[in-house]
A protein has these predicted regions:
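Glycine- and acidic-residue-biased ligand/ion/polar-headgroup-sensing regions
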Residues: 61-81
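Ligand-binding loop in jelly-roll beta-barrel domains
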Residues: 101-125
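Bacterial N-terminal signal peptides that target proteins for export
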Residues: 1-10
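A short glycine-rich, His/Asp/Glu-containing loop-to-beta-strand
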Residues: 32-57, 62-68, 120-122
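Boundary of Sec targeting at the N-terminus
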Residues: 24-28
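Bacterial N-terminal signal peptides
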Residues: 10-22
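Histidine-centered metal-chelating micro-motifs
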Residues: 53-57, 93-109
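Short acidic-glycine-tyrosine-enriched beta hairpin
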Residues: 39-42, 83-101
Length: 126
């Protein structure tokens, strides 16, 4: 009986640990983030997932880039004070070109919608 009880306790502990890790994994993936995909001297590629009301931090782009939209929506390009500089409307399945940013200008990307926006960014380095 003791062996069965020990196995049951071990199984319960393992399941509880797995559930906790699963919840942690879900919390991690529900954050706005960039996921590197590929990089060399010519190009840098990443996936951006922009959750509602979780802006990407201030940054700039020194090179032009193609945006391939996996999940579309409206994206506000905001300044350091969170003031909207422009709004981009991206349709799922479409691709868009964005020029490099003006010298010295930084921006954040803010999704004010209800669903995540997901894009692949292909930044040309030459």
């Amino acid at each position: 009986m003791t062996g069965t009880w020990t196995k049951a306790l071990a199984l319960t502990a393992a399941l509880a640990s797995g559930a906790a890790l699963g919840a942690f994994g879900q919390a991690q993936t529900s954050q706005t983030r960039r996921e590197p995909q590929f990089e060399n001297e010519n190009v840098r590629v990443w996936k951006s997932i922009i959750m509602p009301n979780q802006p990407l931090s201030l940054h700039r782009h020194d090179f032009g880039r193609t945006i391939v939209v996996l999940k579309g929506g409206s994206l506000d390009i905001v300044d350091a004070a969170s003031k909207t500089m422009k709004t981009l409307v991206w349709e799922t399945g479409k691709a868009y070109w964005l020029d490099k940013d003006p010298a010295g200008e930084e921006h954040g990307d803010l999704n004010r919608g209800a669903a995540p926006i997901e894009v692949i960014v292909v930044e040309m380095r030459k």
